[in-house]
């Protein structure tokens, strides 16, 4: 059965330290192409997870929705979908970072490290360090979004790094179709995490991208999710 998002409110949540501006650029074009209505709530770094859940609840008041996001946003959306099977049309998961407890997942380690440096050294020095070790496009993205979320940014990073995502056993109970986009060369969001999500869920597909592709055009990430969803038809 084809998953039809035409006219469907689609709530997409940002990754840790990222924001709704990036979600807009990554997903608005691909979603518009299939007639979906994008809702991209801004992160609330002082209450990151609760803010995401509140946005999902509010959007679902008027009927079933599609949900998803990037990294931690994808994990929160998947957890919400598991808890609300009757209100979830589909799950669009871009760059999932881990399943279950974060443990030593690279994204969790990176968020903890960044939070510790922000607390110790401040925003300017930590941003300079980040820029030196990141691709230029990502450095520019995070410089903008980190500044907007300061001074609560370390709180958001620590909350995300401690988040227990749906486990593979839990994803096996996902009623909604799951479309995953994973990068083949992202050390922070390993391809294996996306493969694990897709292997666990009953109805799921994955498409891959490269960091260079999404750096050149953020919409490549959203397009990969929508292509994966179309494969489920």
What are these regions (language model features)?
Residues 1-46:
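Conserved HGGG/HGGXW glycine-rich cap/lid loop of the alpha/beta-hydrolase fold
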Residues 47-65:
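Conserved acidic catalytic loop of the alpha/beta-hydrolase fold
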Residues 95-144:
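Helix-rich cap/lid subdomain of alpha/beta-hydrolase
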Residues 187-193:
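Conserved alpha/beta-hydrolase "acid-adjacent" motif
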Residues 203-233:
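Catalytic active-site module of serine/aspartate enzymes centered on a nucleophile-bearing elbow/loop
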């Amino acid at each position: 059965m084809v998953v039809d998002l035409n006219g469907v409110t689609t709530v997409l949540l940002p990754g840790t330290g990222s924001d709704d501006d990036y979600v807009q650029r990554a997903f608005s074009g691909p979603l518009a192409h299939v007639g979906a209505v994008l809702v991209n709530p801004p992160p609330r770094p002082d209450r990151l997870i609760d803010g995401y859940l509140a946005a999902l609840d509010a959007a679902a008041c008027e009927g079933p929705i599609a949900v998803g996001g990037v990294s931690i946003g994808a994990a929160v959306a998947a957890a919400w979908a598991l808890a609300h099977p009757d209100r979830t049309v589909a799950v669009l998961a871009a760059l999932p970072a881990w399943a279950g407890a974060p443990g030593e997942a690279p994204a969790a380690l990176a968020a903890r490290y960044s939070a510790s440096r922000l607390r110790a050294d401040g925003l300017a020095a930590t941003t300079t360090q980040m820029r030196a070790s990141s691709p230029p496009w990502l450095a520019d993205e995070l410089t903008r979004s980190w500044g907007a979320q300061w001074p609560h940014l370390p709180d958001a990073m620590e909350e995300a790094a401690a988040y227990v995502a749906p486990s593979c056993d839990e994803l096996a109970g996902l009623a909604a179709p799951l479309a995953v986009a994973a990068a083949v060369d992202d050390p922070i969001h390993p391809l294996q995490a996306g493969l694990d999500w897709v292997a666990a869920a009953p109805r799921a597909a994955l498409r891959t991208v490269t960091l260079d592709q999404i750096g050149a055009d953020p919409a490549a990430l959203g397009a990969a999710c929508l292509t994966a969803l179309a494969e489920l038809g």
